[in-house]
Amino acid sequence: MASSLAAQLAQIAATSTHQLDLKAQRAAHSQSLIFEKKIAGSQDFDTIFQVCHEGFQELCSLDSRFLSFRRNIFSDQSKTEDRGQMTTSQNKELDSVLEDFLSLVGARLLLTPAVKAVDWLIRRFRVHEYNTSFLLLTFLPYHTTPLFLNFLSILPEDLTQTFKVFLPYKRSMTLPPRQVIVQSASTNKSFFSALNNYVLQVSKSQAHYQGLVSFWAGITTEALANMLDSAKSGRMEIETRNKEDVLIRILPVLNDAFMLRKAPQLVVGCYMLCVVLANKASLEDHVLDNLMEAVTGSWTQTNFVSGITCLSVLSQQKHEKSLPSKVVKAVLRLDNVIEVFEELSGRYAVTGLIIGLIRSCVQENGKRSDPARIPFVGQLIQRAILSDSETIEALTILLQAFSDLQRQGLVADGMGKQLSDLLLQFNESDTLAPLLRKAIENAGVDITQLEMTLETVLQADIMPMEIEDADLLDFISSSQTQDAFAVALEPLSQAAITESSFLAPGSSLLFDQLAEAFIHGASTKDRVSRFIKLPVLRPDKPLDDPLYLSFFIRFFSGPYPVTARTVAISIVSSCITAMADKSADMQGILPYIISALADPSERVRREAAALLSLIDRLASKCKDNDDSNAQIWGRGCLYGQNERSESVQFLPMKDIYKIIHHALMPALEEYVLDPDQVGRTLTQVIRGPRSQDDSDRTRSESTGVEFKKPLRRDLFLFLCSHASKTALYTVKLRLLKFLNKVGKIGSLNCTEALRQVFDQWRLLSLEHLQRIEDGERISTNELEDQVLSIIYPKDMDAVDLLFSSLTSNSRSNRESFLTAGFNRLKEVWPSLEETHELSLANRLLQISLSLENGKLAGAAKGLLRSVDLSGPVILEFLNKISASVPDLGSRGPPSKKRRTSQNNMVPMSSMDKETDSVLQKMTFILELIDSSHSENHPELISGLFQTLTIIHHLKLQTRSEMSYLLSLNLGILLSIVNKWKGMPTRKINTSSIRADLIIDCVRTSESPQVQNTALLLVAGLATVAPELVLHSVMPIFTFMGSSVLRKDDEYSALVIDQTIDQVVPPLVQSLRNQKRDVVSGTSELLLSFTTAFEHIPSYRRLRLFEALITKLGPEDFLFAVFAMFANRYSMDKDVLATMTALASDCNAELQLITYARYLNLVKDTLQPKPTLAKTLLGVGSEDGRDPQKIAVDLLQALSHLLKFTSLRTKMSECFDSGTEQQVDKAHGLFSTILEQTLALSESVRTVKPVNSACGETLGTLLGTLSLVDFVDTIEVLLQRPSDDLRRKVIKLLENRLDSSNDRDKASQARVLSFLTVLINILETSPDILLKHAAVACIEKIGEKYGKKDPSQVLAAAKVISGEHCLGQPDRRIRVMGLLCLASMSEILGEGIIPTLPEALPRAIDLLRDTLAASDDDSQLHDAVYSLISALLIHVPWMISGEYLDNILQLSFISSNTDLAEGSDENRLEALQLLAKRVDVKEAFAGVERNWDSAVTQGSRAVQEALDVVRTAIEKHAKSATVKNVSVLMKLLCKAFDLRRLQLSPLNDGGFDEAEVDEIESRANDVAVRMIYKLNDTVFRPLFIDLTAWAVSGLGKKDTTGRVARLTTFYRFLESFFGTLKSIVTGYSSYIIESAVEVLKFSRCNDKATKTLWLAVLRMLRNSFGHDQDEFWQSPTHLASISEPLIKQLSMATNSPTLDLVAAEAIPTIVELAVAADSPDNHKELNTVIMKFMRAGHGNARGADNPYTRLAAVKCEQQLTERLGEEWLALLPEMLPYISELLEDDDENVEREVRRWVLSIEDILGEKLDDMLT
């Protein structure tokens, strides 16, 4: 409550307008852009308005839009407006007007009139405080100018977070650099938003200007780029979210700005922002489209060029290059847009935009399209804006669009007609026709149909055969191709036949020569015909000799151009067609046809499909032939004359027919479309229908046939034999791809069928592989994978074959084969049977741990880590750990002697090697177990605990932490236990669980990971097998308190939560089952947690203890936790905050139960033999704390809980809405607590600290009651005899009222009725302290509720005013009573008057006694002045006459008393209130009456009296001053006579001169302020009287008195002329005569008259200097004063007097010369001055004195410098004097004259040498 009140008061103070704080008001008034603070502070609003209105008028002449402000903020009425007195709605309207003006004036702030006008807003309307944001943003574009420094100086200190960046620059008064503003816009969201909103608001009002928009665009663009750069992140989702946040901030700004088309410069700035967004924000296409539409929707004829530039950048970032329709239409509507594109293309990348426009223009439907689009596209292309490649891209778009229109039949009219005309036009262009042909090739359109539609020829004739691939094009370049073919063919015509088949293994030079020739000749039929007739190919015997066909088979299966390979297949087809009548068996070609059907080229596949059809027709003719007589092509020689060809598998013709016709032919067209389809088909055919999955079966339905297993087996072997024998690795790869998918058919698997391929491949060298890759252009890695896929996973022999191939001769294996082999093992692993897996795993483990072959061991380890090991395998591995270290149990740690002895180095080393080996093995095995879903294998528990035992032994032996091994082992156990918890029915053998080992890990390990895992394991075991761990669980909590609880990471938090959730409940239940006290039994646990509190991260504390108490049971344990907290941490704020939060979560009943048990524990603490307190708090133990201190800490903590928890609220809810039983229980519990507290308080009455703590607890306990119940309780307690207790409860009520916000009528009435009880105490109690408490409480009641019933407060005020309070001799009760009356004055207002007859005299007497006393009683002094101030505020008319005189007299005495600084402030504040509030006549008369009393008390009293008069003049109307001017003049005369009276030789105890000077300065100030409020009619007679009083008021014999009075008078006149200036120059006529007289008799070297001499000269200087009415030009006035004044030069007779004359007299003479301003007058003055420049003139001593001549020269010099050529018009008269003075005997005179001459020459621009000769 207290903090809430403090916050409210702070908020009120922060927003206070300081209406009573004069200093603050003056400071606020002195804030100005054009005046210094001192000057600004002295100006009134009339003066300010006059200056500022001039600037406003000039602005109106510049811009008529300013004229509207004449009616409001620049009207005469505005001078009296005060924002502090306006309502909220009025201020809001004013804000709107001010912002409109600032928006308009922002463009002209560098002009003086604008600054003047803005200064009026600052001075009158305080825009720098009320409209700080708008004003700052108005000035911000000028942040590099001196104007901004002036602006910074007036900014308030409490800038919001939005503009906090400017605070350092305000304090250091330096200009903020641009980068700082950019950085703030980048990082400060509110500043960025404020800047954007300001610019938009100004632009909407049409007040924007170039400087503002440029500044905004530059800052915002850089800031946006910085924000987007900062949004980048390593995580894509975070970066996306960050960039979305930036877009959310900038897109609304762009949306609003684009709508302001009348602000084209602003729109261009938005284009810049769009460019930044496009380049940095990775926008999606739809966002870019919206931006592009916004850009085109915002541009005008003045800025569309910038818009097109922006569009070009946006279009580059799009993935889909077409543009929105609105964008295209907007571009087409622009004038001369083609020329703009031409101009921009040289500077910006507009290609993307142009291509997008072209694409979008041709995408419209032909019948609906805009007819202007196609001509626009034609112009874009024909203007050569695009490069050749870009033009080809554009033409390709046109061709594709035209092709689409062709298909739709829309080429006859509309867009189709326009496009056809445009294409014809391009075809006729010399520059575009070649590009159009290339575009035709790129577009892939049907050239023939296009030519027919356009009725023209689009490209020249090409070769007779269509050419598709780029490789072949390189060979067929017209005549070059003809020559190359001839050259290649010539040697082949005579070549000898050395080959039997080109499919034989090994390289063939002849084949390479033939292939080269065929490539060159494949382009024309003639060359092909010549080629196939080559004798070397044996074309005449294609059936008998495989050479002819084998060439073309190898060619179309090789890496050759597509067209050539297609021709090769067609030649084979032609050959077979020619042999159709010979019934030949051509099944030898079938594998190669299948390979061709899997070729990537569609043309090859299509030609191969045609070939397969021929084979099918041929097979249908031969299917019924006798196989024994059939002629099979290539049989025995297909792969050469060798064993390879003999072992090739062939099938009967009828089976071939079935395979081709029924299996392959139905899906023939699918093979052409999909190169993988033939493989899928054959896989399905061979595997049969039962082995197919649903998707395969669906695909195979098209074959419509199911072959029997023997046929499928034969087909499989047929294809496998060709895959094994063929030397073409491309064919081998394509066959293996589907053969490996077959896997097994019957008892035959692919490993058996393809073993030869595997064996051959394994032996190939790297060089051979490279030759394969280079020669056939295939991936050997892919081929290697297919070869290794031959290994059938379900055949252990096959797996063994692979394993032995990898390990038997591992060093000679290729690295790629090793890697691929282990990858294959990984693939087959899931298919292994358990026994096979176990065998293979053991062998791999052995290899992994071997040190012989690092690569092999690494591969084996990688395999074991990557596969999912089964339960038997990992159990076998785990058992190997214990089997490998059987004797470790007998080993202990080596003794220190053995460890340090040099003689034992060898044995130790050997032991280290053995240990290292064991550790490596253990580590690897545990890692494997950990990664193999060990949670599914509870059978591992026994072995894991054995391993844990081994690790502990190794720790002792090696003195190592073994953290990693322990973490692995415990982690595996934890995963098993966690799985066990989730399956309660699962049975696990718990006999092998060793809780002691886990606890040992917790206690001895230093690794947080090990500790946390062990704790989680204990928590898990406590849930599923509590009997195993509870007996040893306490050390865990001790450890947690010192370790885990202190960690600040999420994992540790999880550990703690699970430990609490799973260990604590069974532990408590176990204690209950044993019928032990649960609190005592868990004290160690509680101690661990409470001790660790300070180390627990703050954000986790509350959640942790909530969980702990919930699991323990709050009814039993909450009080214990609170007590242990309070005992250990006392009043630590963090602990108290946690306790408060914990208590607040409980209901009222639980809180009351907790506090009752808590108080019982406090009572037990103070017992001689404590019980529970000894266990929980250590009371009575040897190292325990003092029980009394413990009790104090506990009680203080309880007080805090009662004060800050929600008990009161929850009790109120219980009483209001609870059941009767709940209410009764709550009442009973509260009564018990109250009884306990009272009893405890009684029992510790003699122990002051504990008793004090009890009283505090009692008070806070009572604070939980409602105010009505609280007052009732207080009344009961006040009936007790103990005054100490009564004081406390009254103080409690006061505190309660101080923090209470009870405003209900019942509470108010009850508290006000309590005043009678307090009055009774005042009247009857002899205890002063009790009375003091009662008065304080009365004051608080009056302050809170007094206005509800003033009569009751008045009754109390009367008692306080009387003898029972103010009449008491005790100082404290008097002070309290006076302060209470001051407070009541505010409450009662005029109602306080009945108390004044008794109160005010007593107060004045008390003040008089205090001032008369020898000791300093500042408190009573201040209290009296507090009452006086309150009365002056609320009933000022009661302070008059005698009361006023007493107050003034005592105040004068107080000023002469040595009091504290605060006391002086209180007195001065009261005097200021007196001046402001008391009737002005009474105030002036009172000061005048008591003037002598003030003088008697010293200068300070006089100064304060004058301050009262000055304030009264200031704060009251002019009429009040006019009416009381006579009294004021009397007072001023007294003040002006102080010098005469106080500095008189007859007055020994008077003021010193400094004090008199200060008093006169204040009196002058009072006089001037009085004069300001008088008019000339009133003041002139007064001035005449004052002059007469000063000049002739004293007798001529009183020389000293006259000098003193004249001195004061002329000092006043100096201020008078200096302040009022030209207004009062005419008053000089009244004092000329007196001034001349003074000049005649006063001397600067005479102490008695020196001050008067100085005053007269300074007065004259001010009068001369401010003459604007030509007063001193009058010969009469000038003549009377000039000569006496100039004669003062003669007083310069020595160095000191020369300095005085130079400092005072000469400047005055110069000012007179300036005021005289006439050649005649100047001549007259100069004549007199020159008299003092020549010896023999002047007074008795004349100018014979060099100092006099020097003074005259200095005077002439200053006149020359000041008046320049005007004065030098008298140069002819001065030249003789100058000549004489240049020869003067005195060096100083001569030197000064030379300076004067130089000054003259400077002005005239010529030398005086000729004139002086």
From Swiss-Prot:
Matching InterPro entries: ARM-like, ARM-type_fold, BP28_C_dom, HEAT_type_2, HEAT_Utp10/HEAT1, U3snoRNP10_N, UTP10
- Segments carrying the region annotation (Disordered) are 686-705, 887-912
Q: Which UniProt keywords apply?
A: Nucleus, Repeat, Ribonucleoprotein, Ribosome biogenesis, rRNA processing
Q: List, alphabetically, the Pfam families matched.
A: BP28CT, HEAT_HEATR1, U3snoRNP10
This entry's Gene Ontology molecular function terms read: snoRNA binding
Query: Where in or outside the cell?
Result: Nucleus, Nucleolus
Q: Would you say which domain of life the source belongs to?
A: Eukaryota
Q: Where are the HEAT repeats?
A: 245-283, 389-427, 428-464, 584-621, 659-695, 1058-1095, 1189-1228, 1265-1302, 1309-1347, 1398-1437, 1678-1715, 1769-1806
Q: Where is the composition biased (Basic and acidic residues)?
A: 690-705
Q: Name one GO biological process term.
A: positive regulation of transcription by RNA polymerase I
Q: Which GO terms describe its cellular component?
A: 90S preribosome; small-subunit processome; t-UTP complex
Q: What is its main location?
A: nucleus
Please describe what this protein does. Involved in nucleolar processing of pre-18S ribosomal RNA. Involved in ribosome biosynthesis.
Instruction: Name the family the entry cites.
Output: Belongs to the HEATR1/UTP10 family.
How it assembles, according to the record, is:
Component of the ribosomal small subunit (SSU) processome.
Would you tell me the protein name for this molecule? U3 small nucleolar RNA-associated protein 10
